[in-house]
């Protein structure tokens, strides 16, 4: 995984400020240590984080880990279970804990 422990903690902390019960996954190229570059792809499974909170969440994450390209998907558990793209992502994703 090409995300430092400190970055992972900061991301998780920022998301959990909005929903303590959420699950946060890193997916995409940052999961593979052999690949270079790439943005930070995050999947958040939350019943509380809505569309309006997503922008403020991105701003907060960038404040904590620095300006980086971040793709943020936020889905409810039901949406995630019904979405084949999300199911594909989760097969290789790493959950931040």
Task: Briefly describe each language-model feature range.
Residues 1-23, 31-37, 46-97:
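Catalytic core of pol beta-like nucleotidyltransferases
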């Amino acid at each position: 995984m090409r995300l430092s422990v400190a970055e992972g903690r900061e991301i998780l902390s920022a998301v959990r400020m909005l929903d303590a019960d959420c699950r946060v996954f890193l997916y995409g190229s940052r999961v593979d240590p052999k690949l270079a570059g790439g943005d930070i792809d995050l999947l958040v499974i939350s019943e509380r984080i809505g569309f309006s909170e997503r922008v403020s969440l991105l701003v907060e994450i960038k404040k904590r880990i620095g300006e980086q390209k971040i793709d943020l998907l936020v889905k409810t558990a039901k949406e995630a279970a019904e979405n084949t793209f999300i199911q594909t992502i989760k097969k290789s994703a790493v959950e931040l804990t």
